[in-house]
């Protein structure tokens, strides 16, 4: 927080909040939420952290479908230039009959 120019008194006040202070109650959740916030400048890292830990508890935006995407789909050229391997890989990520689905979880994505 110091790197963003936040005053020391404000940092102390923030860290003293029960939703932030580690006190044995939901500590892993608190750490996960703070890590997610710390990744704010790097959205992809925050997205990965959320998928890895499940924190914070996020909901999909209205009109975004059922859920927040869990992975990026393969690029449009992959099935053109490497159809055999693309098909094998995309089949592993089939959800609801959709091959190469963004709703499929990768191996480290927390269920």
Language model feature labels by segment:
Residues 1-111:
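Acidic/polar-rich alpha-helix caps and helix-coil junctions
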């Amino acid at each position: 927080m110091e790197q963003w120019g936040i005053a020391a008194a404000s940092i102390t006040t923030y860290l003293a909040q029960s939703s932030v202070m580690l006190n044995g109650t939901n500590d892993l959740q608190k750490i996960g939420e703070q890590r997610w916030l710390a990744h704010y400048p790097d959205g992809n890292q925050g997205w990965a952290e959320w998928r890895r830990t499940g924190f914070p508890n996020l909901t999909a935006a209205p009109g975004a479908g059922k859920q927040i995407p869990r992975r990026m789909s393969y690029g449009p050229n992959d099935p053109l230039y490497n159809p055999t391997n693309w098909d094998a890989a995309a089949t592993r990520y089939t959800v609801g009959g959709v091959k190469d689905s963004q709703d499929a979880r990768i191996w480290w994505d927390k269920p």
